[in-house]
């Protein structure tokens, strides 16, 4: 009979700084002379970028380990028959990265329990855990943001002035926003659009890629806005977004973009970076 191994965890989602406590359960039908039972804990950021096609296709890869530990649970020797539990615990780094899966980058945390048996297939069990930023590490108080389109010192043309109630947000929250349109003159603004844009940057060896996605978008009809008077609205943040992070070979960030669709002219755009996490 094959040796059987499993990993018991109270949950699979954790915050940075959390202690992960569980047990490896080993079941053997007879004595096993093993080289040891151990638990590998790995957190890894990796990037993969491909160039070309067919025979000319080249794939570049880079990776950086956030953590890499081996926890010995049983020394080399004879493991008696029956069911045995081996408890373990480790702490996710306070300054670790959140779990992430994107177009060219990913951050994965995994634990692997292994009974190393010479001249016989090892008993192996893999489990993935999901890591999120601890809320207190992201925001302890609100930091209001003010920004303009173009040069704030230029008083000669149309301009949009934007006020936000903060620069760090969580999924499912609402971004409080207030805009003021200034000096439109004879320009005809057809609409005001607001876009929350997420962007991934990844580097693998000598290759780089940037991927952007519109997370949410809304339009404000000009009939609702008066020039020179503040207009207040809210931008919803979806629940299933990726978390902002900055790693060794990749990062993910957000941009709030507010634009004026001006007839017969280039759009007037004001934008600012935001930190958003799950």
Q: Residue locations for each model-derived region?
A:
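C-terminal beta-sandwich interaction modules and adjacent acidic
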Residues: 1-278
